[in-house]
Amino acid sequence: MSLRNRLSKSGENPEQDEAQKNFMDTYRNGHITMKQLIAKKRLLAAEAEELKPLFMKEVGCHFDDFVTNLIEKSASLDNGGCALTTFSILEEMKKNHRAKDLRAPPEQGKIFISRQSLLDELFEVDHIRTIYHMFIALLILFVLSTIVVDYIDEGRLVLEFNLLAYAFGKFPTVIWTWWAMFLSTLSIPYFLFQRWAHGYSKSSHPLIYSLVHGLLFLVFQLGVLGFVPTYVVLAYTLPPASRFILILEQIRLIMKAHSFVRENIPRVLNAAKEKSSKDPLPTVNQYLYFLFAPTLIYRDNYPRTPTVRWGYVAMQFLQVFGCLFYVYYIFERLCAPLFRNIKQEPFSARVLVLCVFNSILPGVLILFLSFFAFLHCWLNAFAEMLRFGDRMFYKDWWNSTSYSNYYRTWNVVVHDWLYYYVYKDLLWFFSKRFKSAAMLAVFALSAVVHEYALAICLSYFYPVLFVLFMFFGMAFNFIVNDSRKRPIWNIMVWASLFLGYGLILCFYSQEWYARQHCPLKNPTFLDYVRPRTWTCRYVF
């Protein structure tokens, strides 16, 4: 109903019409009492309250249309006003019905637009920046407490970072292994794809030709990127943080190589069908840019910012190092004393419950710091250096009232890869059937990869994260779904996240210290997968 119609219906209310008539009669006679003025004021306020929801609804609809049109227009242009070749390719494929035989519908692909990260926008508000200042003040107090306690215990200032030095030990091995991983990812996938693309249209058996090259690419993904970093990590007995660097880079490069091949195969197939003389291959520079760009979705071109703000880059890296020292002090002041004291009494339900609840605070702080250091500071630093325009690496996950929304907004970079290359491709492959199976596959893959990273980095298999993610996380995804909008559900999401991170920190830390205090002389494979916490009895 429009505002005009709404106003026209005001005459259907006899009480309001009578009040208006009495007021006008009194006004004409030149006599207006205070009582009549108050009645008129209440009448106007009531009408305004009735019109307010309708007015806001119409304004909201117009605003949504305006923003949608603006995004659609800006998506087709980069900052310099030049049309992005990827978008034009997508439009051509959308019009070409033959592309349906080659890949999932192209209109479902991710569209990159220039935008700031959400925290950069929020930090412009003084009230939000104050929360940031609170975390800095807390870090200062952690540092002061450590210095004071060390001075009281040792009688001198002890500025040692033994835990950091141990965690990032054997760093030269990390560097040369990373270079080998990077150079192989830069050369081998591009060479295989280029060789396949040039020979596909000329081959008398294109299917067999494609299967051979696909098998070679799979061997590279699993045999080279999948095996070599893991072997180096285990053979050289790297410490935990050094292991995390190599394993996370291993996973990132595998996902990058898959995206590059996945996005470019349809272009080669289209060119072969149309017998086009135009070379559909991207350049080495485009692939090299993609390997460093803070995204897992390949495009020939991305929105670019006009300049690089080197001061902004330095600030982001400074904040990363600040978060690193923050986590160090959390482990030093909150975690280490807790788990070192666990050995003073045998493992029991009481010890476990106390450990979980005492681990909630450090677990939540580590959650916030990990999110801020990597998803905001680290990715924004590389985005700024590469003039990468689309900075939406996360959304407002803290406002989530459902787990499905939390999974979509917590890590947009990884979510996009899983959504387009696992979920959407499975739906396309099975003709949009088995949606639940496709979602289950996404959860299973994510849970397995997370648990693989932790198992390799910690040198033991303790599937706490796998159980929480695969079973409880998936169940909450269906139970606490997008239909839950009330604030109480946001509280429930936060409470479950707090408890979950407390469980993860408690169980994995207990297992770590149990293996330190109860080592085995000749461990078998089963000893690596059997929890030591359940059988270890500390000797004093």
From Swiss-Prot:
Residues 1-128, 197-208, 267-309, 386-433, 481-486 are cytoplasmic. It is a multi-pass membrane protein. It catalyses: a sterol + a long-chain fatty acyl-CoA = a long-chain 3-hydroxysterol ester + CoA; cholesterol + an acyl-CoA = a cholesterol ester + CoA; cholesterol + (9Z)-octadecenoyl-CoA = cholesteryl (9Z-octadecenoate) + CoA; cholesterol + hexadecanoyl-CoA = cholesteryl hexadecanoate + CoA. Cholesterol binds at residue 127. Residues 151-170, 235-242, 343-359, 459-464, 519-540 are lumenal. GO terms for cellular component: endoplasmic reticulum membrane; membrane. GO terms for molecular function: cholesterol binding; cholesterol O-acyltransferase activity; fatty-acyl-CoA binding; sterol O-acyltransferase activity. Disulfide bonds join 518-536. The chain crosses the membrane at residues 129-150, 171-196, 209-234, 243-266, 310-342, 360-385, 434-458, 465-480, 487-518. GO terms for biological process: cholesterol efflux; cholesterol homeostasis; cholesterol metabolic process; cholesterol storage; macrophage derived foam cell differentiation; positive regulation of amyloid precursor protein biosynthetic process; very-low-density lipoprotein particle assembly. Signal peptide: none annotated. Its EC number is 2.3.1.26. A motif (FYXDWWN motif) lies at residues 393-399. The modification Phosphoserine is found at residue 2. It is found in: Endoplasmic reticulum membrane. Keywords: Acyltransferase, Cholesterol metabolism, Disulfide bond, Endoplasmic reticulum, Lipid metabolism, Membrane, Phosphoprotein, Steroid metabolism, Sterol metabolism, Transferase, Transmembrane, Transmembrane helix. The keyword Phosphoprotein applies. Catalyzes the formation of fatty acid-cholesterol esters, which are less soluble in membranes than cholesterol. Plays a role in lipoprotein assembly and dietary cholesterol absorption. Preferentially utilizes oleoyl-CoA ((9Z)-octadecenoyl-CoA) as a substrate: shows a higher activity towards an acyl-CoA substrate with a double bond at the delta-9 position (9Z) than towards saturated acyl-CoA or an unsaturated acyl-CoA with a double bond at the delta-7 (7Z) or delta-11 (11Z) positions. Belongs to the membrane-bound acyltransferase family. Sterol o-acyltransferase subfamily. This is Sterol O-acyltransferase 1. It comes from Mus musculus (Mouse).
